[in-house]
């Protein structure tokens, strides 16, 4: 599990290394340190937005604000993968589980299907925007209140379609790694599920967690409830589901955050010197 955690965040470090390359060269080791530091800062901020601030500490001062925009592109690519995979999970969920009973007015899972349709439209729009990031720069140029900040977002228009596809590939690989971690923990703790069904339900869990705003340090409770709801449809081993969820949270978030805190202390000492 520790090795998979390192692979998970190593892929994220590679993404960030590619993203900031137009600004300055960052060795992979330094990118890895920046990612861990970002995790440590993010645990106390809504939806981990503090992650951006933790990473840019490793860059030159003149590049920090521009690097935030670059880092957001990386999060954007990960969100696309989360939504696409989550939609696959939602389709499986809707087709196999009638949670809201049908009535004379609504067909089975009517509202779930409405939600699925909305999510598909949103997914199509964000993918189109992802490959047309120049639109965001144009918005900053057209809106007076945003015009002064345009210089900080120009970097997102410098990524080629090839760069963006590479980011999506790395995001997909990372998604597969932390989904596999979850499945392995479930099996290790006696939660018996068909692997592909478990993967689809895990994808649905990640989709819900991406949509619902939360703070990382308080995320565990919500993650536990969502996991019990979806994985509980496949297995009655509730204790195993909770244990796997807590284990994944500790391995993929708490441990990197602790490492990041130590690294941030080193950055501060270096600056003091």
Task: Identify the role of each PLM range.
Residues 29-30, 48, 62-76, 235-247:
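Membrane-interface alpha-helices at helix entry/exit sites of multi-pass transporters
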Residues 32-58:
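Extended non-transmembrane interhelical loops and adjacent amphipathic helices
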Residues 21-24, 54-58, 69, 151-158, ...:
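Short amphipathic alpha-helical coupling elements at transmembrane boundaries
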Residues 50-60, 215-232:
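Re-entrant/interfacial helical elements at transmembrane boundaries that shape
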Residues 40-45, 69-91, 246-258:
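Membrane-embedded alpha-helical segments of transport systems
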Residues 1-35, 92-212, 251-273:
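Predominantly cytoplasmic-facing regulatory/coupling regions of multi-pass membrane proteins
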Residues 41-43, 203-222:
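Transmembrane alpha-helix interface/packing and boundary motifs in multi-pass membrane proteins
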């Amino acid at each position: 599990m520790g090795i998979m955690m390192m692979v998970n965040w190593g892929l994220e470090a590679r993404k960030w290394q590619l993203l900031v390359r137009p600004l300055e060269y960052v060795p992979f080791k330094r990118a890895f340190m920046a990612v861990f530091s970002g995790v440590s800062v993010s645990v106390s901020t809504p939806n981990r937005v503090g992650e951006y601030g933790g990473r840019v500490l490793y860059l030159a001062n003149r590049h920090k604000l521009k690097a935030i925009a670059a880092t957001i592109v990386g999060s954007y690519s990960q969100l696309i993968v989360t939504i696409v995979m989550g939609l696959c999970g939602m389709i499986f969920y809707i087709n196999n589980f009638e949670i809201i009973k049908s009535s004379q007015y609504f067909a089975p899972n009517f509202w779930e299907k409405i939600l699925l349709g909305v999510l598909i439209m949103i997914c199509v729009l964000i993918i189109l925007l992802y490959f047309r990031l120049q639109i965001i720069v144009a918005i900053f140029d057209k809106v007076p209140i945003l015009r002064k900040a345009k210089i900080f977002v120009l970097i997102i228009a410098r990524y080629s379609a090839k760069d963006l596809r590479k980011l999506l590939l790395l995001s997909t690989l990372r998604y597969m790694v932390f989904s596999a971690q979850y499945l392995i923990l479930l099996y290790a703790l006696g939660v018996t599920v068909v692997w592909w069904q478990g993967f689809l339900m895990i994808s649905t869990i990640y989709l819900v967690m991406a949509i619902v705003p939360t703070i990382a340090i308080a995320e565990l409770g919500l993650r536990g409830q969502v996991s019990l709801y979806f994985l509980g449809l496949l297995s009655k081993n509730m204790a195993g589901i909770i244990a796997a969820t807590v284990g994944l949270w500790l391995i993929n978030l708490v441990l990197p955050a602790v490492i990041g805190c130590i690294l941030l202390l080193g950055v501060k000492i270096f600056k003091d010197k």
